[in-house]
Amino acid sequence: MTDESTADAGRDFIRDIVAADLASGKHKSVVTRFPPEPNGYLHLGHAKSICLNFGIAEEFGGCCHLRFDDTNPTKEEQEYIDAIQRDVRWLGFDWGKNLHYASDYFEQLYAWAQHLVRAGKAYVDDQSQEDIRLARGTLTEPGRDSPFRDRPVDENLDLFARMRAGEFPNGARVLRARIDMASGNINLRDPVLYRILHAPHPRTGTAWNIYPSYDFAHGQSDSIEHITHSICTLEFEDHRPLYDWFLDNLPVPSRPHQYEFARLNVTHTLLSKRILTELVRGGHVAGWDDPRMPTLAGLQRRGVPAEALREFIKRIGVAKANSTVDVGMLDFAIRETLNKSAPRRMAVLRPLKIVIENYPEGESEELEAVNHPDDPSRGTRRIRFGRELYIEQDDFMENPPKKFFRLSPGREVRLRYAYFVTCREVVKNAAGDVVELRCTYDPATKGGNAPDGRKVKATMHWVSAAEAVPAEIRLYGHLFATAQPDAANFASELNPQSLETLSGMVEPALARDDTDGAVQFERQGYFCRDRDSSPGRLVFNRTVGLRDTWAKVAAAGS
């Protein structure tokens, strides 16, 4: 974090600029935009941009446009358009009537390209893509002029019109801006404005055989929509001179200004759209909404509340310098949000059966359990207690170390909402594995307190063997094992333990709950019901643990 980020105050350098522009009268109102390309699913980085652009508009009484940058028809699909709109709404924002597409402006963009040609500031180039790349030069060497750079205006206009009409094959010609092949900024070395592409467009069909570049479409679309503050990430900082060049040389209706902020980088995470696509296509994950993915669809399926994501983004702030945020900050925001909202239930992830030998056979009783310890208004529920129960395997050790206070032979513990129990006998199978515990209970300790004042050092959760419901429990961890995964070798850094699937037992209330919202499994973490659930088959995803277990594992292995 830099000193330019003032997240605690809810202000940052971009908001300061907006406030100053409004105070000075430079702008009467603020208009921002979020302009995704519909060629994939939104991820954490997009969430930061969404919250910034929509948040600024909301805070300053303006509006934010949702504009799809649909200038590459071979990569764009309606599936992504629909998903992006769902994700923006899920985050809590609404573009109202301001839904736009760059393709809405294709005719105007074409006319402006002709304007540049007539002014001698654009030309048709017959060179191949590779020849153009080689002639562009390097950071230390100037570029070389195209042999077609001085084509007559009339010839350029004719060729450009024929490009549009579809007379030439893909790659045969491009339209380039005529700026400065010796510029120290490579983006100003006669960038491509249009390329030939014989491909149907999702919205315009086969009407166009040429498509504008992002750099040409972006700023002019901003101007058409009267965007006041065009906010993007730092990798576009070197594109700003080109953004301004187009606005300076075209009869545009308004003059937006581009501002750049640091993109979001998170530990144990890669946000490259290319890598995310390869993860999906390579079968490393189960789709774009796999709960391990940093996509907004994946976060939703994992059970992350939009409120937690907005709070996380608010806390990391907006800065001018790139940095990496510990994923633990996101986990903290999730825990803090869910701690307030999630009802409590009991679930045993790795069941170990216990038999309470002095509890009457064939009998059971109802006990009262609170739904939320900090909110009495959430009420209570009834849970059934009987002779046979399930506890966590991890809550028993036959030969415990000094600081292990849970169940062991001869030790007494408290069962939550129920009684004190003592382990009397350990039952093992032929392989020597513990399969059952024989215990006794103290009937006088109902509710969890002993009349004689004796204390126990552990309270454990449990479920009734007679009434518990089987459930598949999916424990999700970091997708990448290393904190700073190498994008070039991402496949080798995948965490082999990023998903563990367990066969657990849960209290029957979880089968009756008709909500897909989050729930806290007491002493375990926050979980949500997965869409794979069906009648007779419960599936739960872990959203986040109650504490940072990863840090403990990492420390133990170091």
Swiss-Prot record:
One of its GO terms (cellular component) is cytosol. Its EC number is 6.1.1.18. It comes from Nitrobacter hamburgensis (strain DSM 10229 / NCIMB 13809 / X14). L-glutamine binds at D69, Y214. ATP binds at residues 37-39, 43-49, 233, 263-264, 271-273. GO terms for biological process: glutaminyl-tRNA aminoacylation; glutamyl-tRNA aminoacylation. It holds the Pfam family tRNA-synt_1c. A motif ('HIGH' region) lies at residues 36-46. This is Glutamine--tRNA ligase. It catalyses: tRNA(Gln) + L-glutamine + ATP = L-glutaminyl-tRNA(Gln) + AMP + diphosphate. SUPFAM superfamilies: Nucleotidylyl transferase, Ribosomal protein L25-like. Belongs to the class-I aminoacyl-tRNA synthetase family. It is found in: Cytoplasm. Keywords: Aminoacyl-tRNA synthetase, ATP-binding, Cytoplasm, Ligase, Nucleotide-binding, Protein biosynthesis. A motif ('KMSKS' region) lies at residues 270-274. InterPro entries: aa-tRNA-synth_I_CS (IPR001412), Gln-tRNA-synth (IPR004514), Gln/Glu-tRNA_Ligase (IPR050132), Gln_tRNA_ligase_bac (IPR022861), Glu/Gln-tRNA-synth (IPR000924), Glu/Gln-tRNA-synth_Ib_cat-dom (IPR020058), Glu/Gln-tRNA-synth_Ib_codon-bd (IPR020059), Glu_tRNA_lig_a-bdl (IPR020061). It is an enzyme of class 6 (ligase). GO terms for molecular function: ATP binding; glutamine-tRNA ligase activity. Its main location: cytoplasm. Monomer.
